[in-house]
């Protein structure tokens, strides 16, 4: 059973936006409505331009989304911005499920090296993008 807290924080100790759950849901929806089509457009643009056995469209959106989230965290974005842009936009832009599916598809196609490469590159590049963006925004912002 999850207990409700009344101190302005969510059940996982993250600050919530003033106005409660309805405002948070609206912010996530707004961010998601922007992130999902951006994901689709980036994926299609990359896939149309580069022919590769690696799923470079998914890799690109995951790296970009990780960098955006890292920038928000590094800049100490406020609650509403982190909810809309971090959870909503970046959540819709990035895609772990497609990453998993495409990796399994590579395995079932017998492309084991590409599958391993996809996992290593995706994780390393996404974590690296977060780290770089946090570092950059910490350096740029006082």
Swiss-Prot record:
Catalysed reactions, as listed in the record: fluoride(in) = fluoride(out)
Notes on how activity is controlled: Na(+) is not transported, but it plays an essential structural role and its presence is essential for fluoride channel function.
Residues the entry annotates as binding Na(+): 91, 94
Keyword Ribonucleoprotein attached: no
Subcellular location: Cell membrane
Membrane topology according to the record: Multi-pass membrane protein
Keywords: Cell membrane, Ion channel, Ion transport, Membrane, Metal-binding, Sodium, Transmembrane, Transmembrane helix, Transport
Alphabetical list of InterPro entries matching this protein: FluC
Gene Ontology cellular component list: plasma membrane
GO molecular function: fluoride channel activity; metal ion binding
Residue stretches in coiled coil: none
Record-level GO BP terms: cellular detoxification of fluoride
Transmembrane segments: 23-43, 54-74, 79-99, 116-136
Main location: membrane
Keyword Manganese: no
Family per similarity comment: Belongs to the fluoride channel Fluc/FEX (TC 1.A.43) family.
Matches recorded under PANTHER family: FLUORIDE EXPORT PROTEIN 1-RELATED
Described purpose of this protein according to its UniProt entry: Fluoride-specific ion channel. Important for reducing fluoride concentration in the cell, thus reducing its toxicity.
Name this polypeptide is given: Fluoride-specific ion channel FluC 1
Gene: fluC1
């Amino acid at each position: 059973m999850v207990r409700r807290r009344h101190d302005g924080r969510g059940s996982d100790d993250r600050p919530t936006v003033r106005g409660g759950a309805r405002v948070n849901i609206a912010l996530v929806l707004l961010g998601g409505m922007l992130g999902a089509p951006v994901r689709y457009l980036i994926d299609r643009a990359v896939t149309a331009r580069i022919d590769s056995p690696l799923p470079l469209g998914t890799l690109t959106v995951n790296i970009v989304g990780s960098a955006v989230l890292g920038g928000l965290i590094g800049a100490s974005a406020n609650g509403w911005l982190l909810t809309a842009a971090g959870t909503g936009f970046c959540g819709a832009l990035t895609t772990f499920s497609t990453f998993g599916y495409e990796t399994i598809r590579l395995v079932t196609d017998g492309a084991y090296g590409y599958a391993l490469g996809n996992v290593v590159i995706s994780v390393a590049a996404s974590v690296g993008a977060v780290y770089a963006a946090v570092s950059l925004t910490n350096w740029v912002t006082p």
